[in-house]
Amino acid sequence: MSTKKIFEERLQELEAIVTRLENGDVPLEEAISEFQKGMVLSKDLQKTLQAAEKTLVKVMQADGTELEMDA
């Protein structure tokens, strides 16, 4: 298996961070660290989604030509 976590695992990790921070019972230093980790995960997930969107925007027509669709 790849050393890079799959999208779903990273999303679950981000959701767990958000939950911990929303609960408000995290010490300040840990909250800052978790927030930073969450921001990195968020940016990485966004990049993954954008790449997937670019891939899905192009559809092959029956004759093999690409049809560019509005995103």
UniProtKB/Swiss-Prot annotation:
Cellular component terms (Gene Ontology): cytosol; exodeoxyribonuclease VII complex
Pfam families found in the cross-reference section: Exonuc_VII_S
UniProt-listed InterPro entries: Exonuc_VII_S (IPR003761), Exonuc_VII_ssu_sf (IPR037004)
Subcellular location: Cytoplasm
Principal location listed in the UniProt entry: cytoplasm
HAMAP family found in the cross-reference section: Exonuc_7_S
Quaternary structure annotation from Swiss-Prot or TrEMBL: Heterooligomer composed of large and small subunits.
Family indicated by similarity: Belongs to the XseB family.
Organism name: Streptococcus equi subsp. equi (strain 4047)
Gene: xseB
Protein name stated in the entry: Exodeoxyribonuclease 7 small subunit
The EC number(s) this enzyme carries: 3.1.11.6
Catalysed reactions, semicolon-separated: Exonucleolytic cleavage in either 5'- to 3'- or 3'- to 5'-direction to yield nucleoside 5'-phosphates
One GO-annotated biological process of the protein: DNA catabolic process
MF GO annotations: exodeoxyribonuclease VII activity
Function: Bidirectionally degrades single-stranded DNA into large acid-insoluble oligonucleotides, which are then degraded further into small acid-soluble oligonucleotides.
Source organism, top-level taxon: Bacteria
Keywords on record: Cytoplasm, Exonuclease, Hydrolase, Nuclease
